[in-house]
Amino acid sequence: MAQIRYYATGRRKTSVAKVWLSPGNGKIIVNDKNMEEYFPLETLRIIVKQPLTLTETLNKYDVIAKVKGGGLSGQAGALRHGIARALVLADPTLRPVLKKAGFLTRDPRMVERKKYGLKKARRAPQFSKR
């Protein structure tokens, strides 16, 4: 018998997470590594687990994810977005809770481009009066 798997994608900054959610006991595997191995900081692990802890489904589903692009913070955010979307596919009654927490909304903030004549996006070169 084939196991039910729910697929969703999450995005944040330049990171894209492909998430497969299946009934299980709470294992989270990111890029073929354990989540504790992949995300060295506890804060990043908390971000990834947020949708599951909020909906009290932490030990009900296994998460397998492939993450590409960006840094660890962006990848954690993309993973959170993907897990939240997959949870809604698995159980549509969780949608209002996740929506209220803002986990279903794609964070539109991106890195601002560098402009010519400036050192960074907004940082101007030092001004000398004399």
Swiss-Prot record:
Swiss-Prot/TrEMBL GO biological process terms: translation
Disulfide partners: none
Top-rank lineage group of the source organism: Bacteria
Keywords associated with the record: Ribonucleoprotein, Ribosomal protein
Signal sequence region: none
PROSITE patterns per the UniProt record, alphabetical: RIBOSOMAL_S9 (PS00360)
One CC-aspect GO term: cytosolic small ribosomal subunit
A molecular function (GO) term: RNA binding
Family statement drawn from the similarity comment of this UniProt entry: Belongs to the universal ribosomal protein uS9 family.
Stored NCBIfam families: PRK00132.1 (NF001099)
PANTHER family: RIBOSOMAL PROTEIN S9, SMALL RIBOSOMAL SUBUNIT PROTEIN US9M
The name this protein goes by in its record: Small ribosomal subunit protein uS9
